[in-house]
């Protein structure tokens, strides 16, 4: 009582409002979008649909794909991948992003549990469910049957962004020719999807690279014969420098290990 007597009306009002807000937030938690976590990702759940492609052995994952990763097994992505509809693919900007997906409760054919996948391709535009504004995931069959019965063929799902857990450092595959240097970063942890790449030769200043297609980044600055450092920024705003990741003797077709990750 003595404590209350010393409090002003304003202080009492602020405490009451704070308590009311906490009550509303917790009691309606299922309807409140989750705020971005410390990793800067939007962790709210959204609705979409999912189907599958290929066979039980993962057929189809060895194809190039719209992100440019090529053979997904060779590049370490394996079967835990998905082709995204146009709305989610975002012209290739979502390549490398990781998602947690679970079948929506109750629909026939759904199984409990969830899966985590990396975005590596664009869902075929010829499929009606891949057109704008539909949100859709084409999963490899081995991943689909972890959340739904194969006979369901297509199911409603819920999805959210999650940090990518990758083993080892970021890898950089060198493509192109002396006139156009193209870099494919892969095995990217953290947010996974990249929004900017810059390159610096041992004799040049930093050069901003352009997204060529998918996750391929390019510049027409000739860096042949120079050791090359690469600067990568992921969608959560984190930037990491990979100093002299490419030695002066680098060549086209080679892949270099950044040693560290996000």
Swiss-Prot record:
<keyword id="KW-0134">Cell wall</keyword>
<keyword id="KW-0472">Membrane</keyword>
<dbReference type="Pfam" id="PF01357">
    <property type="entry name" value="Expansin_C"/>
</dbReference>
<feature type="domain" description="Expansin-like EG45">
    <location>
        <begin position="64"/>
        <end position="169"/>
    </location>
</feature>
<comment type="similarity">
    <text>Belongs to the expansin family. Expansin A subfamily.</text>
</comment>
<comment type="function">
    <text>Causes loosening and extension of plant cell walls by disrupting non-covalent bonding between cellulose microfibrils and matrix glucans. No enzymatic activity has been found.</text>
</comment>
<dbReference type="InterPro" id="IPR036908">
    <property type="entry name" value="RlpA-like_sf"/>
</dbReference>
<dbReference type="GO" id="GO:0009828">
    <property type="term" value="P:plant-type cell wall loosening"/>
</dbReference>
<dbReference type="GO" id="GO:0009653">
    <property type="term" value="P:anatomical structure morphogenesis"/>
</dbReference>
<dbReference type="InterPro" id="IPR009009">
    <property type="entry name" value="RlpA-like_DPBB"/>
</dbReference>
<keyword id="KW-0964">Secreted</keyword>
<keyword id="KW-0732">Signal</keyword>
<dbReference type="GO" id="GO:0016020">
    <property type="term" value="C:membrane"/>
</dbReference>
<dbReference type="InterPro" id="IPR007118">
    <property type="entry name" value="Expan_Lol_pI"/>
</dbReference>
<dbReference type="InterPro" id="IPR007112">
    <property type="entry name" value="Expansin/allergen_DPBB_dom"/>
</dbReference>
<dbReference type="InterPro" id="IPR002963">
    <property type="entry name" value="Expansin"/>
</dbReference>
<dbReference type="Pfam" id="PF03330">
    <property type="entry name" value="DPBB_1"/>
</dbReference>
<protein>
    <recommendedName>
        <fullName>Expansin-A21</fullName>
    </recommendedName>
</protein>
<keyword id="KW-0961">Cell wall biogenesis/degradation</keyword>
<dbReference type="InterPro" id="IPR007117">
    <property type="entry name" value="Expansin_CBD"/>
</dbReference>
<dbReference type="InterPro" id="IPR036749">
    <property type="entry name" value="Expansin_CBD_sf"/>
</dbReference>
<dbReference type="GO" id="GO:0005576">
    <property type="term" value="C:extracellular region"/>
</dbReference>
<feature type="domain" description="Expansin-like CBD">
    <location>
        <begin position="179"/>
        <end position="258"/>
    </location>
</feature>
<feature type="signal peptide">
    <location>
        <begin position="1"/>
        <end position="29"/>
    </location>
</feature>
């Amino acid at each position: 009582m003595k404590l209350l007597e010393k409090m002003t009306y304003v202080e009492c009002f602020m405490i009451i409002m704070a308590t009311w807000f906490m009550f509303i937030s917790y009691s309606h938690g299922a309807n409140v979008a989750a705020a971005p976590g410390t990793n800067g990702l939007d962790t709210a759940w959204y609705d979409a649909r999912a189907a599958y492609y290929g066979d039980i052995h993962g057929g189809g994952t060895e194809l190039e794909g719209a992100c440019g990763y090529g053979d997904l097994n060779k590049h370490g992505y394996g079967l835990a991948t998905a082709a995204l509809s146009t709305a989610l693919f975002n012209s290739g900007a979502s390549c490398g992003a990781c998602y947690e997906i679970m079948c929506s409760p109750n629909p026939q054919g759904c199984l409990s549990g969830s899966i985590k996948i990396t975005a590596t391709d664009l869902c075929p535009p010829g499929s009606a469910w891949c057109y704008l504004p539909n949100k859709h995931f084409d999963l490899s069959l081995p991943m689909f049957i972890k959340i739904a019965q194969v006979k369901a063929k297509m199911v409603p799902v819920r999805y959210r962004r999650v940090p990518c857990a990758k083993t080892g450092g970021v890898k950089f595959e060198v493509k192109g020719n002396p006139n156009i240097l193209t870099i494919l970063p892969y095995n990217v942890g953290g947010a996974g999807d990249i929004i900017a790449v810059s390159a610096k030769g041992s004799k040049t200043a930093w050069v901003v690279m352009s997204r060529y297609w998918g996750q391929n980044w390019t510049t027409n600055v000739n860096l042949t014969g120079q050791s090359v450092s690469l600067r990568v920024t992921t969608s959560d705003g984190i930037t990491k420098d990979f100093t002299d990741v490419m030695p002066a003797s680098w060549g086209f077709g080679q892949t270099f290990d950044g040693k560290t990750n996000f």
